[in-house]
Amino acid sequence: MEKNPITLLILNGKSAGNDELREAIGELRKDGYTLHVRVTWEYGDAKRYVEEAIQLKADNVIAAGGDGTVNEVAAALAVQPEAVRPCLGIVPLGTANDFATSCQIPMEMHNALTLAIKGRATAIDIAKVNDGHYFINMATGGFATRITTETPAKMKAALGSASYVLHALFRMDMLQAERCEIHGPDFHWSGDTLVIAVGNGRQAGGGQQLCPEALINDGLLELSVLSATELLPNMLQAWFTGSENQNMISATLPWLEISAPDDMTFNLDGEPLTAKRFRIEVLPAAIHCRLPPQCSLLE
């Protein structure tokens, strides 16, 4: 008889009172599954719990939270030796849940938890930025970064992903271009940009398809740059309706480097990183993740 897997669930503290998740955990425990639960309260907790999972010889580590929680857990898994690395599972509990939504992970707690424990384990890529920073979904820079990092927590809680668009409309005074240079294999671009997106996944900011062709197991990243040739009208048209825009520059690359005369801030799935230079590279098949058969981000 095959043993039931050992699972450690890392729960974002903001969702610690979720009754639906508590009920789903109880049901799976009654079915014989070993489920340890740990709650994060500050940055660094997830890394410590991943290390604990390895000591427990856990088969799965579940990130229960939003995109930031998923990324923090994935980054902690990526630096562990492959021989002892647990498989990542995802239970979406955040505001936007962009990565989980793109992967078509169920929003219903019992179904998501069951998938995270028993679903198909698939090797997926993650991206490394400079030394020691990672993202599983997307890095965004420019106006989009300011919006996603400055949208008030109360607005996000009340309105969900629509809060990002609403806050963007409130803060058009922040709309200014940033000069930078981007290069990678057989690619070079320089100029003024409003938004830069580097995607392992496809969407960010509450459902905006910034990198619509990205895949999470192809060993490549999708780059999308909105140049500042024309400001507000074309930006809104391209980024909020998904229509084609001549000021959009796209490329598919295994790595790229971005340099700027002034500090730029990128949002790495919720983690802000400020620098004048960024090297972003894909780490192919860096971790395994339990995903549904219909996941559209797989080759």
Curated annotation (Swiss-Prot):
GO biological process entries: phospholipid biosynthetic process
Keyword Hydrolase tagged: no
Cofactor-binding details, from the entry: Binds 1 Mg(2+) ion per subunit. Ca(2+) may be able to substitute.
Active site: 271
Binding site for Mg(2+): 215, 218, 220
Pfam families per the UniProt record, alphabetical: DAGK_cat, YegS_C
UniProt xrefs under SMART domains: DAGKc
Gene Ontology molecular function: any one: ATP binding
UniProt keyword Metal-binding, yes or no: yes
Domain DAGKc: 2-133
Keywords: ATP-binding, Cytoplasm, Kinase, Lipid biosynthesis, Lipid metabolism, Magnesium, Metal-binding, Nucleotide-binding, Phospholipid biosynthesis, Phospholipid metabolism, Transferase
Compartments where located: Cytoplasm
GO cellular component assignments: cytoplasm; plasma membrane
Cofactor: Mg(2+); Ca(2+)
Superkingdom of this protein's organism: Bacteria
Cystine crosslinks: none
UniProt cross-references to NCBIfam families, sorted A to Z: lip_kinase_YegS, PRK13054.1, YegS/Rv2252/BmrU family lipid kinase
Chain's role: Probably phosphorylates lipids; the in vivo substrate is unknown.
Assigned protein family: Belongs to the diacylglycerol/lipid kinase family. YegS lipid kinase subfamily.
Name listed for the protein in its UniProt record: Probable lipid kinase YegS-like
